[in-house]
Amino acid sequence: MKDFVIGKTTEEMLTTISKSNELGKLSKDRIWIEIERSLQSKYASEFFKLLLNFNLITPWLERLTNPDCSDDNSAEIKWAELEAKNNFELGKNIPVPNNFKLYVGLLKSLIECEKNLPENDLIACIEKLNFHRNEKEMIGLLNLKILSSNKDFIAKLASNVLAEDFTSLKEVSKNEVKNVKLHLIKKAIKNTYA
């Protein structure tokens, strides 16, 4: 598809579809099925460029302005990258499955997780990311260019959080869990800046 050229007849047909609002008559679920199929291909960016070039984004992807994603990634990571490049507003009109939403939420939190954040904000970021539960997903997301300036910091922070023994939370009373967890997170943060 990378070198694929659309013929004149197909261009005219796509223009007609765009003007007729035919896509608006399709179900949200059908739209997502086609989007997911394109995300699973190695030419997802080309698909979204085509939608943009022929104005086939109404009403489902009206917030699409940047169609580029790293085509070597999983469908979930491609979608998260597209969301990030489109101000996290791309999936507002379509039924995005939870596994895709997970990656979008994680990427948004990873972008917000910066080295110069105040400690309380960094703690909130760590709690949102839940490194123990989402380690595999974050490893894939950290390879995105959008995180390149912060990748080393996040990787070091993740390593330090994962190195802490959160199993000790089982041994403390319910009243103490929050304080012990906070202590472990602060220790991981301190080790990250050391």
Language model regions located:
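Short, polar/flexible loop-turn hinges at active-site or ligand-entry regions and domain interfaces
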Residues: 2-8
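Conserved, hydrophobic alpha-helical core segments of structured domains
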Residues: 12, 16-149
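Charged substrate- and nucleic-acid-binding regions of tRNA-handling and nucleotidyl-transfer enzymes
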Residues: 1, 130-194
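Short amphipathic alpha-helical interaction patches enriched in hydrophobic/aromatic residues
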Residues: 1-2, 21
